[in-house]
C-alpha cells in the first residue's frame, strides 16, 4: 500500500514538472518567434518603413510589415503606386522628379531633397536617422532596374550602426552583428553575403560550416547554405560587414 502511495506521489510530481517544462518551452518559443519576426528590434521600439520604387511585394507582406511600423515613408516614385493600393504614407521623400500626386484627402507630408549625390532611398534613410530611428524596414527595393537593386544592397555598408532589413516576397536581408544567433528550422536556406571583406567567420548548425574563414565579393560568398537541425544557428566574425539572407 505504501509503495502504491509513493508511486502516486512520484507520478504527481512528474506531471507537475512536465507541465512546468512545457510552460517554459512555450515561453521560449514565443520569445524566439518575436525575435525572428522583428530582427533585432527590441521590445518597445517601433521601426520605420520605407517603400522604395522597385518591384512590388505582395500586399499581404506589405500590410504585415506596416503593422510593425507605424511610420511609413515612400520614395516619390512609389507614392502613386501606393495610393492605388489604398496605402497612404506619412511622408514622401525625393527630388520629386517622378512624383504624381493623386487626389486624396489623406494628410501626407512631402519633403523635396535635391541632392543628386544620394539616391532617394539614401535620402529617406538619412531623414529617418536624423529623426532618431535606429531600426528601418525597406520594401520594393529589389527587382526592376538592376543598378538600383545592386546599389540598394551595397548601400547597407553606408549605415553600419542602423538596423536595416530589406524584404521581398522570397527573402529578407540584413547585416548581422559580429556575434549572431537565431532559431531556424531544419532545411532552411541561409546565404551569407559579405558587404565588405569579412574575416574569421565561424558558423554552427549549418550543413556547410565555416571555421575562421573569409568571405569577399568577387572571390567567395556563402550562398545557399542549409540549416542542419531545428534550433539555434550561430554566426561569428571579427571584421567587415556580413549580411544574411
Where are these regions (language model features)?
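Positively charged N-terminal leader segments that act as targeting/secretion signals
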Residues: 1-15
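Solvent-exposed alpha-helices and their adjacent loops that cap or buttress functional pockets
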Residues: 39-44, 64-67, 85, 103, ...
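Short, positively charged and aromatic/hydrophobic N-terminal segments
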Residues: 16, 30-34
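N-terminal beta-strand-loop-alpha-helix module at the start
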Residues: 35-103
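Long, charged alpha-helical interface segments
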Residues: 176-245
Amino acid at each position: 500500500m505504501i509503495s502504491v502511495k509513493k508511486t502516486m506521489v512520484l507520478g504527481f510530481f512528474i506531471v507537475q514538472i512536465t507541465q512546468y517544462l512545457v510552460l517554459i518551452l512555450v515561453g521560449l518559443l514565443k520569445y524566439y518567434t518575436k525575435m525572428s519576426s522583428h530582427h533585432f528590434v527590441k521590445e518597445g521600439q517601433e521601426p520605420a518603413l520605407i517603400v522604395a520604387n522597385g518591384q512590388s511585394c505582395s500586399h499581404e507582406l506589405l500590410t504585415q510589415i506596416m503593422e510593425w511600423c507605424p511610420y511609413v515613408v515612400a520614395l516619390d516614385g512609389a507614392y502613386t503606386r501606393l495610393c492605388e493600393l489604398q496605402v497612404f504614407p506619412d511622408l514622401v521623400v525625393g527630388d520629386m522628379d517622378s512624383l504624381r500626386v493623386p487626389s486624396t484627402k489623406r494628410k501626407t507630408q512631402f519633403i523635396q531633397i535635391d541632392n543628386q549625390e544620394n539616391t532617394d532611398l539614401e535620402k529617406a534613410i538619412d531623414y529617418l536617422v536624423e529623426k532618431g530611428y535606429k531600426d528601418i524596414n525597406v520594401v520594393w527595393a529589389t527587382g526592376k532596374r538592376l543598378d538600383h537593386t545592386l546599389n540598394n544592397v551595397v548601400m547597407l555598408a553606408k549605415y553600419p550602426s542602423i538596423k536595416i532589413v530589406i524584404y521581398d516576397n522570397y527573402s529578407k536581408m540584413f547585416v548581422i552583428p559580429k556575434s549572431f544567433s537565431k532559431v531556424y528550422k531544419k532545411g532552411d536556406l541561409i546565404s551569407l553575403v559579405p558587404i565588405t571583406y569579412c574575416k574569421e567567420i565561424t558558423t554552427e548548425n549549418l550543413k556547410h560550416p565555416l571555421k575562421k574563414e573569409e568571405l569577399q565579393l568577387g572571390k567567395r560568398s556563402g550562398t545557399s547554405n542549409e540549416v542542419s537541425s531545428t534550433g539555434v544557428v550561430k554566426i561569428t566574425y571579427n571584421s567587415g560587414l556580413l549580411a544574411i539572407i
